Amino acid sequence: MVNFKKTYVLKLYVAGNTPNSVRALKTLKNILEDEFKGVYALKVIDVLKNPQLAEEDKILATPTLSKILPPPVRKIIGDLSDREKVLIGLDLLYEEIRERESEL
């Protein structure tokens, strides 16, 4: 049986190259590489350069992390430094636990 892994599609909205934006991106990349290496796509959107994208996606504050796929869409606004809160907020931690339990 072939086991296809899900691909996680995420968007990180930042406002320029501020220390807060750089920290959010670095922290997020660490989490994704540790937990979802090879099965994620991350798009970083600078709302100062692309305000229309922020408006279309109803982004009101930065940094905002949005999980697009797999559904449902989830968003985290603000501090991304707490690994567990990020995973829980995006419904990724519980999803992985459920999958592991179903394999038992």
From Swiss-Prot:
BP-aspect Gene Ontology terms: circadian rhythm
UniProt xrefs under Pfam families: KaiB
Alphabetic keyword roster: Biological rhythms
InterPro entries for this protein: Circ_KaiB (IPR013474), KaiB-like (IPR039022), KaiB_domain (IPR011649), Thioredoxin-like_sf (IPR036249)
Written domain comment of the UniProt record: Has 2 forms, fold switches to a thioredoxin-like fold (KaiB(fs)) when bound to KaiC.
Family the UniProt entry places it in: Belongs to the KaiB family.
Assembly: The KaiABC complex composition changes during the circadian cycle to control KaiC phosphorylation. Complexes KaiC(6), KaiA(2-4):KaiC(6), KaiB(6):KaiC(6) and KaiC(6):KaiB(6):KaiA(12) are among the most important forms, many form cooperatively. Undergoes a major conformational rearrangment; in the free state forms homotetramers as a dimer of dimers. When bound to the CI domain of KaiC switches to a monomeric thioredoxin-fold (KaiB(fs)). KaiB(fs) binds CikA, leading it to dephosphorylate phospho-RpaA.
Function (record text): Key component of the KaiABC oscillator complex, which constitutes the main circadian regulator in cyanobacteria. Complex composition changes during the circadian cycle to control KaiC phosphorylation. KaiA stimulates KaiC autophosphorylation, while KaiB sequesters KaiA, leading to KaiC autodephosphorylation. Phospho-Ser-431 KaiC accumulation triggers binding of KaiB to form the KaiB(6):KaiC(6) complex, leading to changes in output regulators CikA and SasA. KaiB switches to a thioredoxin-like fold (KaiB(fs)) when bound to KaiC. A metamorphic protein which reversibly switches between an inactive tetrameric fold and a rare, thioredoxin-like monomeric fold (KaiB(fs)). KaiB(fs) binds phospho-KaiC, KaiA and CikA. KaiA and CikA compete for binding to KaiB(fs), and KaiB(fs) and SasA compete for binding to KaiC, thus the clock oscillator and output signal pathway are tightly coupled.
Cross-referenced PANTHER family: CIRCADIAN CLOCK PROTEIN KAIB2, KAIB-LIKE PROTEIN 1
UniProt-recorded name of the protein: Circadian clock oscillator protein KaiB
